[in-house]
């Protein structure tokens, strides 16, 4: 028997042994062979395209400039500079914890699959095949079958519900991320118009119209999956080029200004400007952290591209991409912020501006047209970020549908709906149902919030905290619910029998920090951004949480009956 045949024999034997375990002890997830043989993704993502989609999505230097209004009002340049250091450190810890899981259990469902696998209680001991010299094909086939939901023994409602909740938290976090990108791009376009027409008065419906138009255009780019690796690489190169050009042009242009003196370093690194109304500068600093934290949103995107990378390669590529994205994001955003803050000649005008970054460009260059050009480069980069976010959210929903359709009664609405979301449309090789449903959700969010600045803050806070919760739950289960040493030994003994060993040690420290950071953000980012609190400036993030958990309850409840 050849090696590939032996791998399939292992999967068959596992299902046979599980089938003899009494039903009262387990609920096996089963999918028909026809469901498993449907259209699959092409494995056409490599290191550069995977890094491209991850970095294009977070795009820290653009994120920090697009949401600068909150940070500037909460503490000025000092908050953003030191906030970036804080956000980068904790994001790195979260990234390491994600990389730990992705290295041993590659699956496009990400955290939801890891939770499902960690809570698995094996009733029988299965012997895995051993090879003297396994080939790459053997390794890929084995991992693709081993790291699938239909090969996980589901023995409790807690296991089932926990994994689904994590998957849905991750998905809604991605949805709100796309919404925040559309909103920031709309504000960027309006900021250009304001610069060229100083008498312009901002209306909320202007932001709303721009939001919906941008969302409609972004929808078109994820219909075909074939160009996505090239778009991702284009986004990576465009982002780095735009960063370099805008930074250099601003610094050089500011150097030619002999009228206005350079700001003192003490004003940038040591002066805290609290305009929030909070009496406590510490509290003002904390609520303003939403700006630098948003610069590192979506660091898990690479974990959801496993099907388009390959299960074998992803064990090594995904952790490296996550860490590289965070490090490069911090370096570019930190340099960018420090440089541009030295270009400010009138901080009051920056604070009062519709879009502070455009005002900084104008103060640095003294030329409206050149400032518009620089902002257009940022918009182009942000547009690719929106495409990457659309890819990310559709992959989460597609993998969720594929993994959890069997949890529902065959023929039920939930079963049929998730099966539909899992389908890849032939010819497009893209999950169009998942993609269009996700874009509709983004459209609905825009209709609810109608372009208010308070709504934008709630959107970016929701995307931060929902994603962090989806990162923290697997870490919490790994540390405090299961016997972690036994789990690691079991996975390594299963996977490394055919796959090349991955010598990663899962340290407790990043997982503990990830949990604590999530709790911190969940509590403190829910406080009002400014005082006194009115209906217009209230932090509505808690309302978002309530709605999201109501929807999650409706989706998950039928699986518990």
UniProtKB/Swiss-Prot annotation:
Cytoplasmic compartment segments = 1-49, 99-160, 226-230, 303-321, 391-439, 483-507, 561
Q: Which residues form the signal peptide?
A: none
The residue ranges crossing the membrane are: 50-70, 78-98, 161-181, 205-225, 231-251, 282-302, 322-342, 370-390, 440-460, 462-482, 508-528, 541-560
Compartments in which it is found: Membrane
Which GO MF terms does the UniProt record name?
Answer: gamma-aminobutyric acid transmembrane transporter activity; transmembrane transporter activity
- Give the Extracellular membrane side ranges: 71-77, 182-204, 252-281, 343-369, 461, 529-540
What's a Pfam family in this record? Answer: AA_permease_2
Keywords from the named record = Membrane, Transmembrane, Transmembrane helix, Transport
Return the InterPro entries for the record.
Answer: AA/rel_permease1
Q: Name one GO cellular component term.
A: endoplasmic reticulum
Q: Does the keyword Membrane apply?
A: yes
Q: How does it sit in the membrane?
A: Multi-pass membrane protein
Biological processes annotated in GO: biotin biosynthetic process; gamma-aminobutyric acid transport; vitamin transport
The text of the family note is:
Belongs to the amino acid-polyamine-organocation (APC) superfamily.
The job of this chain, per UniProt, is described as: Transport into the cell of 7-keto 8-aminopelargonic acid.
Q: What name does the UniProt record give this protein? A: 7-keto 8-aminopelargonic acid transporter
Organism expressing this protein natively: Saccharomyces cerevisiae (strain ATCC 204508 / S288c)
Q: Which gene encodes it?
A: BIO5
């Amino acid at each position: 028997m050849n090696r590939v045949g032996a791998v399939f024999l292992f999967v068959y034997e596992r299902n046979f042994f599980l089938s003899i375990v009494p039903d009262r002890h387990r609920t096996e997830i089963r999918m028909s062979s026809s469901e498993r043989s449907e259209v699959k993704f092409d494995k056409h993502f490599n290191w550069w395209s995977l890094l491209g989609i991850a970095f294009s999505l977070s795009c820290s230097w653009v994120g920090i400039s697009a949401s600068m209004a909150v940070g500037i009002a909460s503490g000025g340049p000092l908050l953003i500079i030191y906030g970036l250091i804080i956000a980068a450190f904790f994001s790195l810890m979260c990234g390491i914890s994600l990389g730990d899981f992705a290295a041993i259990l590659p699956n496009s469902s990400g955290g939801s699959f890891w939770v499902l696998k960690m809570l698995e209680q094996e009733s029988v001991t299965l012997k895995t095949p051993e090879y003297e010299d396994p080939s790459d094909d053997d390794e890929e086939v084995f991992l693709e079958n081993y790291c699938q939901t239909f090969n996980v023994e589901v023995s409790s409602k807690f296991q089932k519900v926990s994994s689904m909740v994590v998957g849905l938290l991750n998905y809604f976090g991605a949805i709100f991320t796309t919404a925040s990108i559309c909103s920031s791009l709309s504000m960027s376009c309006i900021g250009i118009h304001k610069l060229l027409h100083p008498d312009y008065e901002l209306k909320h419906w202007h932001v709303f119209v721009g939001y919906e138009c941008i969302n409609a255009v972004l929808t078109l780019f994820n219909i075909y999956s074939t160009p996505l690796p090239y778009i991702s690489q284009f986004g990576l190169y465009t982002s780095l080029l735009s960063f370099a050009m805008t930074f250099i042009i601003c610094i050089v242009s500011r150097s030619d200004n002999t009228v206005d003196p350079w700001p003192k370093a003490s004003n940038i690194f040591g002066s805290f400007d609290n305009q929030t109304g909070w009496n406590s500068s510490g509290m003002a600093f904390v609520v303003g952290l939403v700006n630098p934290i948003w610069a590192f949103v979506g660091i898990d995107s690479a974990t959801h591209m496993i099907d388009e990378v390959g299960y074998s390669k992803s064990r090594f590529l995904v952790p490296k991409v996550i860490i590289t994205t965070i490090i490069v994001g911090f370096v570019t955003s930190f340099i960018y912020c420090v440089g541009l803050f030295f270009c400010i000649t009138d901080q009051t005008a920056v604070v009062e501006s519709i879009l502070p970054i455009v005002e900084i460009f104008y103060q640095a260059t003294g030329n409206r047209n050149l400032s518009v050009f620089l902002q257009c480069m940022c918009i182009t980069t942000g547009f690719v970020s929106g495409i990457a976010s659309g890819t990310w959210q559709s992959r989460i929903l597609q993998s969720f549908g594929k993994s959890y359709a069997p949890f529902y009664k065959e023929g039920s609405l939930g079963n049929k709906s998730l099966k539909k979301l899992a389908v890849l449309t032939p010819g497009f090789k893209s999950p169009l149902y998942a993609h269009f449903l996700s874009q509709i959700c983004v459209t609905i969010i825009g209709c609810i919030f109608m372009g208010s600045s308070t709504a934008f803050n709630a959107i970016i806070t929701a995307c931060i905290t929902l994603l962090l919760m989806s990162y923290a739950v697997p870490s919490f289960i790994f540390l405090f619910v299961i016997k972690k040493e036994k789990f690691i030994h079991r996975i390594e003994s299963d996977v490394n029998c055919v796959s090349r060993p991955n010598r990663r040690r899962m340290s407790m420290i990043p997982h503990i920090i990830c949990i604590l950071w999530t709790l911190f953000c969940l509590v403190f980012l829910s406080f009002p951004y400014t005082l006194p609190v009115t209906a217009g400036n209230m932090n509505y993030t808690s309302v978002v949480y309530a709605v999201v958990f109501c929807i999650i309850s409706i989706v998950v409840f039928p699986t518990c009956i």
